[in-house]
């Protein structure tokens, strides 16, 4: 089936056979897979004007298509002819997978195509290769006469055999009936143990005879009656071609089992001719050995010697017993001539195998050289075609350039003529245009005059009409503006009213807010003022009390001083009068408080004092050198002495039978007031008095040195000796003693009004048990500087201080922590939020928050608004008296 390519005019361009493809540099034609129309693909370099053809809707130049297709077709046909001629002259190589018969036929044609000199050269090369290999193998053999004669015999034998072999080949080549060259057999003869090389000892003759007998083949006349041994080869395939297995020089009537010799040759060929050379060496050794035996046998007895006859040696050889027994059973034996003939035939087959390889190699080289020459020729032809094509293309380009130049000249001439015609035409058109312009101007002037007249009339009418329209428009605009002004006025009034209402509402809200804040501020100020006023009144009262107490104390000290001087004079007089009286007895002098005084003023408090209070005899302290005291401590000692003199009744009153028992409460109050007056100078005027909530429990470690007698009935006063540690006194004498430096109590004050103990200013409350043991020296375990004296607490810090609640006026010793106040404020705000007590912005009154937060305080202590503000700073938004937690609940 063919397809054709046609041009537009229906002319057939080229035929395409089925599955045929033509390719050139510019065009490629091939069959489509399932399309009935021809397909083509072209890479078009240029497109010129001319006759076109359409192939699959692609415009192509007919000349280029035809040229490209014809060129591709010519190359394809030439390549096909060349391939056919090569196949006819030289059949395909063996590597192409041909059958053995085709392979032999190919080698046969090649051999016949060679000249006589080429054939002789191939045979000579083979002979030289065998001789060179034999020389290389015998290079290291011994140099004895036997080995020398053996080498010479081998060379002579090879010369003879190759000469005869070439004659046979030449005769076969010149004969009319050309038999096929022998090819390798499919079977291989197991002859690895038949031939052995190297220098042999005395058994060389027997081994060579054995090898010769094994390689010998009976003639055709005896082939049917004498079978070959089993170990000499394999049977040929019954289906094989007998002609393929015939070597050169064989007759058609020969036995088919002669292929075993071919197997021997194949085996020799696979070993690169090594075993063949060994076989030749054995033959030469055998010949030399026979010659020596003949020479030795002539002296002993006449023996009939036949060349290459070694039947007796074969029969005596133990290794060849099986082969000899088979031939002895048949009753036939081979002569020496037959063995030599069989050896020559074996060599011919072996040489044919090796020569066939040489011929095959030469055939391959010849084919390769021919193909290379053909390729070079095709390359040269291609280059020639390319050069011709380039020349044609150059000529075509030159023609195109010349054509373009001619066309350009024609176009320039046409342009020049067109320009001249255009100038002439433009000139005529300009004259005609000028005439028409003048005519048009004249007509235009006439039209303008008429138009001006009409325009003046129309303008008058238009002006009157416009004035009327303007009047109507002004009236209409005035009405519209009046309506707009009226509407704007109403809107302005409404807006002003709305703004005024909003402003009033905002003002009312602001006023209410300001009033509320002002009320809260006034309330807070009132509370703060009340607090400040209360503090001021309390301070004034305390100042007055302190001033009054100071005046009274001054008067009291003056009076006591006078009384003391009197008492000293009286004591001195009594001491001189009663030197022999024991110290434990009462003094003879008596001091009686006047009955007109109901009590002694201590600290501004009037307390009743008994008129005649019996005083127990005072035990005198042992006369010991007293340490020097600092001025501060001396003042306290003087005050204690004044108190002792004041509380000690007059000696004259001891004899009075009337006994007055003072009230415990009044005596305790007097003692407290006296204690305050004694401690206040050391504390300074800025120290606030203890609040009403501060308990007065065991004020210790503050006692100045000195003993104070107890107020009670006679016989109930216990004397306590004063023991002052010398080291402690030295420590105190280094500087003024402050209340914080007095560390250890010297004694306790007893229950005022009852039987008490002698001691220093110490406990005001009655002790649980009276002091009955003597006062021990003060301990120096803790230094004075480590303790702080606090007269308002039960003890100073570092020993046994305990936090006690204070009052709001003088501050609290246990303030509420800030986190407790904040948490209580958050809980209170949440409660007020649930109750709806907050405004629209989430603020709540600080006073209400403070009152509610008092319930949520975990410590149970109260706090003020200022403490609430201080604790909630940063957690609450505080605006005036309003508070709100940041971030909400």
UniProtKB/Swiss-Prot annotation:
Biased composition (Low complexity): 218-229
GO cellular component: cytoplasm
Compositionally biased tracts (Basic residues): 39-49, 397-408
Residue segments, region Disordered: 31-51, 197-255, 291-339, 380-610, 648-701
Keywords, in A-Z order: Coiled coil, Cytoplasm, Stress response
Compartments, as annotated in UniProt: Cytoplasm
Coiled-coil segments: 363-581
Biased composition (Polar residues): 201-215, 593-604, 663-672
Highest taxon, organism lineage: Eukaryota
InterPro entries, sorted: NST1 (IPR025279)
Pfam families from the UniProt entry: NST1 (PF13945)
Biased composition (Basic and acidic residues): 380-396, 409-577
Acidic residues composition bias: residue spans: 236-255, 295-320
Known role: May act as a negative regulator of salt tolerance.
Family: Belongs to the NST1 family.
Protein name: Stress response protein NST1
Organism listed in the record: Yarrowia lipolytica (strain CLIB 122 / E 150) (Yeast)
Name of the encoding gene: NST1
């Amino acid at each position: 089936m063919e397809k054709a390519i046609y041009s537009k005019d229906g002319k057939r361009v080229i035929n395409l056979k089925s599955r045929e493809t033509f390719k050139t540099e510019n065009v490629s034609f091939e069959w489509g897979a399932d399309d009935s129309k021809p397909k083509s693909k072209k890479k078009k370099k240029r497109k010129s004007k001319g006759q076109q053809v359409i192939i699959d809707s692609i415009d192509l130049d007919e000349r280029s298509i035809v040229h490209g297709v014809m060129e591709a077709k010519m190359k394809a046909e030439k390549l096909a002819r060349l391939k056919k001629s090569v196949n006819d002259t030289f059949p395909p190589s063996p590597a192409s997978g041909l059958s053995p018969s085709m392979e032999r036929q190919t080698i046969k044609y090649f051999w016949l195509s060679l000249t006589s000199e080429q054939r002789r050269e191939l045979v000579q090369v083979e002979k030289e290769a065998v001789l060179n290999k034999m020389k290389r193998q015998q290079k290291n053999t011994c140099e004895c006469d036997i080995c020398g004669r053996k080498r010479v015999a081998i060379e002579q034998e090879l010369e003879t055999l190759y000469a005869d072999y070439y004659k046979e080949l030449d005769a076969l080549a010149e004969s009319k009936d050309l038999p096929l060259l022998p090819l390798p057999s499919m079977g291989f003869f197991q002859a690895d143990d038949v031939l052995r090389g190297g220098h042999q000892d005395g058994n060389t003759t027997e081994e060579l005879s054995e090898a010769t007998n094994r390689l010998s083949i009976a003639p055709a006349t005896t082939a049917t009656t004498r079978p070959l041994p089993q170990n000499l080869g394999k049977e040929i395939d019954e289906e094989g071609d007998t002609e393929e297995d015939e070597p050169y020089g064989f007759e058609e009537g020969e036995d088919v089992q002669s292929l075993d010799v071919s197997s021997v040759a194949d085996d020799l060929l696979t070993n690169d001719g090594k075993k063949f050379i060994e076989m030749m060496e054995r033959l030469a050794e055998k010949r030399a050995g026979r010659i020596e035996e003949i020479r030795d046998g002539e002296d002993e007895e006449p023996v009939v010697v036949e060349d290459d006859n070694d039947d007796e040696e074969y029969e005596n050889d133990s290794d060849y017993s099986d082969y000899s027994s088979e031939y002895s059973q048949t009753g036939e034996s081979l002569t020496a001539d037959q063995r030599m003939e069989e050896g020559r035939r074996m060599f011919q087959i072996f040489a044919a195998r090796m020569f066939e390889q040489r011929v095959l190699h030469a055939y391959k080289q010849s084919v390769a050289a021919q193909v290379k020459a053909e390729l070079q020729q095709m390359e040269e032809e291609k280059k020639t075609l390319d050069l011709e094509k380039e020349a044609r293309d150059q000529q075509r380009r030159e023609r195109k350039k010349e054509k373009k130049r001619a066309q350009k000249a024609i176009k320039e001439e046409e342009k020049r003529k067109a320009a001249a015609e255009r100038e002439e035409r433009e000139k005529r058109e300009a004259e005609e245009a000028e005439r028409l312009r003048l005519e048009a101007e004249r007509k235009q002037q006439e039209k303008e005059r008429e138009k001006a007249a009409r325009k003046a009339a129309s303008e008058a009418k238009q002006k009157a009409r416009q004035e009327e329209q303007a009047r109507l428009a002004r009236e209409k605009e005035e009405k519209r503006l009046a309506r707009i002004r009226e509407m704007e006025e109403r809107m302005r009034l409404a807006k002003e009213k709305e703004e005024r209402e909003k402003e009033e509402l905002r003002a009312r809200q602001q006023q209410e807010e300001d009033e509320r804040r002002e009320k809260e501020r006034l309330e807070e100020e009132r509370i703060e003022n009340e607090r400040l006023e209360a503090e001021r009144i309390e301070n004034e009262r305390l100042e007055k009390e302190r001033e009054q107490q100071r005046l009274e104390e001054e008067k009291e000290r003056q009076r006591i001083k006078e009384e003391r001087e009197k008492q000293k004079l009286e004591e001195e007089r009594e001491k001189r009068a009663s030197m022999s009286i024991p110290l434990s007895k009462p003094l003879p002098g008596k001091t009686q408080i006047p009955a007109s005084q109901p009590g002694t003023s201590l600290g501004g408090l009037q307390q009743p004092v008994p008129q005649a209070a019996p005083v127990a005899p005072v035990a005198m302290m042992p006369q010991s050198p007293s340490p020097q005291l600092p001025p501060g401590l001396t003042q306290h000692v003087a005050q204690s002495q004044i108190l002792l003199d004041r509380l000690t009744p007059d000696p004259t009153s001891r004899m009075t039978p009337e006994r007055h028992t003072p009230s415990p409460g009044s005596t305790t109050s007097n003692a407290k007031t006296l204690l305050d007056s004694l401690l206040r100078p050391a504390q300074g005027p800025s120290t606030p008095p203890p609040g009403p909530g501060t308990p007065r429990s065991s004020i210790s470690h503050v006692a100045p040195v000195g003993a104070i007698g107890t107020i009670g009935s006679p016989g109930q006063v216990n004397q306590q000796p004063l023991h002052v540690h010398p080291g402690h006194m030295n420590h105190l004498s280094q500087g003024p003693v402050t209340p914080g430096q007095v560390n250890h109590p010297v004694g306790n004050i007893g229950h005022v009004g009852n039987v008490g103990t002698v001691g220093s200013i110490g406990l005001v409350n009655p002790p649980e048990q009276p002091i009955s043991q003597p006062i021990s020296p003060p301990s120096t375990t803790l230094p004075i500087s480590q303790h702080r004296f606090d007269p308002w607490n039960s003890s100073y810090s570092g020993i046994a201080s305990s936090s006690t609640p204070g009052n709001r006026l003088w501050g609290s010793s246990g303030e509420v922590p800030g986190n407790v106040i904040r948490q209580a404020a958050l809980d209170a705000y949440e409660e007020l939020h649930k109750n709806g007590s907050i405004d629209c912005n989430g603020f709540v009154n600080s006073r209400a928050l403070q009152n509610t937060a008092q319930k949520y305080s975990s410590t149970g202590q109260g706090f003020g608004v200022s403490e609430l503000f201080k604790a909630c700073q940063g957690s609450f938004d505080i605006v005036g008296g309003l508070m709100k937690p940041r971030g909400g609940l």
